[in-house]
């Protein structure tokens, strides 16, 4: 890169849905010669994960208010003010050309601090419905981007940056054509409210028998209980694991996936080109429902709300899908994916830095 090295500050905290897309954009711009630092919180996943990617991280002290008591609500303005001041000092020391907000509690104080320091803010909303922080930050952002249509009325739809190994998977027609035998069902539980999946899928396995084979990620600490449930159902032959390290390999193996519909999961399922049964987490603003809806509308997935997610409903749905149907759904999933999301977000960061 000619001239002075451009500097980016990425704001992303709390969950993989915020942090992993931020890392994808960071690595893309670092490969172009950019210097990148991270703004996060010291007690969440980014604190250990981001340095593993060769990126220095700064911390501010901030947490969410949802579900907190009255005292936390009353002291919130003071804590937010302090977090903004912390972020301002970090911005002044680092002097970024642009700040990229990818979500999490850190984005509110960080985005305001950037604006107060005269640094352009590019905002990316991962979910199909915008959270409170991003709705507020959109008023001061230089550019607002969204992964799914509908979060903001006039924002560009750029998708969610996903891992390169998922993007590199063969297309559905190559991967799925000619497959025989039981339908391969990938079950992704683990983080947010996976108990319903862990309770229901052993019963589905018992109902469908040799029609399906499962690879089931159950999440931390749940392996003994779920393994026992499969054994009691007479279905001990399925692969039941606590965590899947290589999700690209799991997607490549699968014919269909059963999972929650967090923003990054939905984007990965589309990029992989997989049919899905989505079970949205029961959040009051129905964020995960809106994430999954574009794939259902495209004929690539079915949404089953948690109260209706029973062994009977899931078994009936899986039994109704033959391999030709699954291939058609897989191709529709891939058709609505945005495989160059990382490049699109990075391009907006570059554009914002030039107009600063």
From Swiss-Prot:
Membrane topology: Peripheral membrane protein
Keywords: Cell cycle, Cell division, Cell inner membrane, Cell membrane, Cell shape, Cell wall biogenesis/degradation, Glycosyltransferase, Membrane, Peptidoglycan synthesis, Transferase
Reactions the enzyme catalyzes: di-trans,octa-cis-undecaprenyl diphospho-N-acetyl-alpha-D-muramoyl-L-alanyl-D-glutamyl-meso-2,6-diaminopimeloyl-D-alanyl-D-alanine + UDP-N-acetyl-alpha-D-glucosamine = di-trans,octa-cis-undecaprenyl diphospho-[N-acetyl-alpha-D-glucosaminyl-(1->4)]-N-acetyl-alpha-D-muramoyl-L-alanyl-D-glutamyl-meso-2,6-diaminopimeloyl-D-alanyl-D-alanine + UDP + H(+)
UniProt keyword annotation of Nucleus present: no
Matches recorded under Gene3D superfamilies: Glycogen Phosphorylase B (3.40.50.2000)
GO cellular component: plasma membrane
Domain of life: Bacteria
InterPro entries: GlcNAc_MurG, Glyco_trans_28_C, GlycoTrans_28_N
Signal sequence residues: none
SUPFAM superfamilies associated with the record: UDP-Glycosyltransferase/glycogen phosphorylase (SSF53756)
Record: residues binding UDP-N-acetyl-alpha-D-glucosamine: 15-17, 127, 163, 191, 244, 263-268, 288
Pathway connected to this protein: Cell wall biogenesis; peptidoglycan biosynthesis
Subcellular location: Cell inner membrane
Molecular function terms, GO-annotated: UDP-N-acetyl-D-glucosamine:N-acetylmuramoyl-L-alanyl-D-glutamyl-meso-2,6-diaminopimelyl-D-alanyl-D-alanine-diphosphoundecaprenol 4-beta-N-acetylglucosaminlytransferase activity; undecaprenyldiphospho-muramoylpentapeptide beta-N-acetylglucosaminyltransferase activity
The UniProt record lists the keyword Nucleotide-binding: no
UniProt GO BP: carbohydrate metabolic process; cell division; cell wall organization; lipid glycosylation; peptidoglycan biosynthetic process; regulation of cell shape
EC number: 2.4.1.227
Biological function: Cell wall formation. Catalyzes the transfer of a GlcNAc subunit on undecaprenyl-pyrophosphoryl-MurNAc-pentapeptide (lipid intermediate I) to form undecaprenyl-pyrophosphoryl-MurNAc-(pentapeptide)GlcNAc (lipid intermediate II).
Similarity comment text for this entry: Belongs to the glycosyltransferase 28 family. MurG subfamily.
Protein name: UDP-N-acetylglucosamine--N-acetylmuramyl-(pentapeptide) pyrophosphoryl-undecaprenol N-acetylglucosamine transferase
Organism annotation: Yersinia pestis (strain Pestoides F)
Lineage: Bacteria, Pseudomonadati, Pseudomonadota, Gammaproteobacteria, Enterobacterales
UniProt gene name: murG
């Amino acid at each position: 890169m000619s001239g002075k090295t451009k500097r980016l500050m990425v704001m992303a905290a709390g969950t993989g849905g915020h942090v992993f897309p931020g890392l994808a954009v960071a690595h893309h711009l670092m490969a172009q010669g950019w210097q990148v630092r991270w703004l996060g919180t010291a007690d969440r996943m980014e604190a250990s994960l981001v340095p593993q990617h060769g990126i220095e991280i700064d911390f501010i002290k901030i947490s969410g208010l949802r579900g907190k008591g009255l005292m936390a609500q009353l002291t919130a303005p003071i804590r937010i003010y302090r977090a903004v001041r912390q972020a301002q000092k970090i911005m002044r020391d680092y002097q970024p050309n642009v700040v990229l907000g990818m979500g999490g509690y850190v984005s509110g104080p960080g985005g305001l601090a950037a604006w107060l320091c005269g640094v352009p803010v590019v905002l990316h909303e991962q979910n199909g419905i915008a959270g409170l922080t991003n709705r507020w930050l959109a008023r001061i952002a230089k550019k607002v981007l969204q992964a799914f249509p509908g979060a903001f009325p006039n924002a560009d739809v750029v998708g969610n940056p996903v891992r390169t190994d998922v993007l590199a998977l063969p297309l559905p027609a190559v991967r799925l054509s000619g497959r025989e035998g039981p339908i391969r069902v990938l079950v992704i539980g683990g983080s947010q409210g996976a108990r319903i999946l862990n309770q229901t899928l052993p019963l589905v396995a018992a109902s469908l028998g040799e029609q399906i084979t499962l690879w089931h990620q159950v999440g931390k600490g749940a392996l003994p209980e779920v393994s026992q449930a499969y054994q009691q159902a007479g279905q001990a032959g399925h692969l039941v694991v606590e965590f899947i390290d290589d999700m690209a390999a799991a997607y490549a193996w699968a014919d269909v996936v059963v999972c929650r519909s967090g923003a990054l999961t939905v984007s990965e399922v589309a990029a992989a080109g997989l049919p899905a049964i989505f079970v949205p987490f029961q959040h009051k603003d129905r964020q995960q429902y809106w994430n999954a809806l574009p794939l259902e509308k495209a004929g690539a997935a079915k949404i089953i709300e948690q109260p209706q997610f029973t062994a009977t409903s899931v078994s009936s749905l899986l039994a109704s899908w033959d391999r030709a149907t699954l291939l058609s759904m897989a191709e529709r999933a891939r058709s609505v994916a945005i495989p160059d999301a990382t490049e699109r977000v990075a391009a907006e960061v570059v554009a914002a830095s030039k107009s600063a």
